[in-house]
Amino acid sequence: MSYLFTSESVSEGHPDKVSDQISDAILDQFLATDPDSKVACETLVTTGQVVLAGEVKSRSYVDVQETARRVIERIGYTKSEYGFDTRSCGIFSSIHEQSADINRGVDRSDRSEQGAGDQGMMFGYATNETENYMPLTVDLAHHLLYELAAIRKEPSSPMPYLRPDAKSQVTIEHDDEGRPVRIDTIVISTQHDEFVQASDGISEAEADRMMQERIHHDIATILIPRVKMLYKPEIAALFDEKVRLFVNPTGKFVIGGPHGDTGLTGRKIIVDTYGGRASHGGGAFSGKDPSKVDRSAAYAARHIAKNMVAAGVADEMLVQVAYAIGVAEPVSIYVNTKGRSHVALSDGQIAEKIKKIFDMRPYAIEQRLKLRNPIYEETAAYGHFGREPYEAYKTFVDEHGTEQMRIVELFTWEKLDYVDKIRAEFGLS
């Protein structure tokens, strides 16, 4: 029997994502000049104000206020009428030194035996329903907002009224084998200028109706066609005439961003991962250096699941890994192929083979995925998974105010670099 499944995403201008991006930008600045930095940075944003807090152990000096303002400007909060803008917002920092009690459980003279930064369980997931091995619902939700932001930032934008805050939600019908067969509903809520105002000849209700009609038309005729072009024909065909499209269902979305809602680091953990299709251990990613297994082990688990599915071991795979604080080896590795395995092994036996192929000690993960590099700001909006790995030039400022250019490799956990090893281990051709 067919069923409906829904995932959501939020834009880079959503207040929680503003917080995530500031936290990760500060993390990157520390790692750029001291790769051994231990960082846990939390951000709160609200009307006209940014509050930074957290714990750091580093040889670097970072101008956290300047870093936060740069992020806010890049996102697009540059006008005072937004109630939150890069030039006038106040920034308060209460970042302090990391607890020695935590650090003693992590650092080791033999770095390969570095302990996990905390206890907990982390999950990785992959499915072959899309080219990037992500659930289509969340992949489409991300692409809708990524393209909407791109339209907003165009010099001669066809949607010049757009503001930074936005949300999307996608509902897809799946057949009884879990394959997407039809897009049922798309919801887009996007912040906008008040580009039609009540006057002598136009009531407030009429002005609101005119704005909503224009935005709905532009989403349907500008945004949706651009997003369809990103996909192969078989997925683009799921956008049929029966799709229900809701645009700004409340009728108006002028007040938004941190002025409309307070934002906090780590409040969009389902958007950051698999859109609700897979389990989540509860630990957020942003603002955390890779000694925190909440982040590094979740990336490693995704790397495993994606390579296993790409190798043909299963059509779908969930991987759980769990740690004790201060202990290097994980206490457990669990696999669930949801009954869609292509090998004559139990899920427990598959997990044993994973242990042979992948070293899941924290330091080994850091080295394998190059996680001690300043690579995190780019992850903090539009999902940490399903992104294309690439090299980028990034500029950082050292403690002397000198700019440094770095080439870094982003989204290394999305590489399909273990497929051959997996096929050899499982005897797959």
From Swiss-Prot:
Binding sites annotated in the UniProt record for L-methionine: E55, Q98, D261, K292
GO cellular component: cytoplasm
Catalytic activity: L-methionine + ATP + H2O = S-adenosyl-L-methionine + phosphate + diphosphate
A molecular function GO annotation: methionine adenosyltransferase activity
Compartments where located: Cytoplasm
Co-factor binding details: Binds 2 divalent ions per subunit.
Residues involved in Mg(2+) binding: D16
Top-rank lineage group of the source organism: Bacteria
Stretches for region Flexible loop: 98-108
Binding, K(+): E42
InterPro entries membership: ADOMET_SYNTHASE_CS, S-AdoMet_synt_C, S-AdoMet_synt_central, S-AdoMet_synt_N, S-AdoMet_synthetase, S-AdoMet_synthetase_sfam
Gene3D superfamilies documented for this protein: 3.30.300.10
Pfam families given in the database record: S-AdoMet_synt_C, S-AdoMet_synt_M, S-AdoMet_synt_N
Keywords associated with the record: ATP-binding, Cytoplasm, Magnesium, Metal-binding, Nucleotide-binding, One-carbon metabolism, Potassium, Transferase
Binding-site residues, ATP: H14, D165, A166, K167, K252, F253, D261, R267, K268, A284, K288
Predominant place of localization: cytoplasm
Extent of the signal sequence: none
EC number: 2.5.1.6
Catalytic class of the enzyme: transferase
Cofactor: Mg(2+); K(+)
GO BP term, pick one: S-adenosylmethionine biosynthetic process
Family assignment from sequence similarity: Belongs to the AdoMet synthase family.
Subunit composition and interactions: Homotetramer; dimer of dimers.
Protein name as annotated: S-adenosylmethionine synthase
Source organism of this protein record: Porphyromonas gingivalis (strain ATCC BAA-308 / W83)
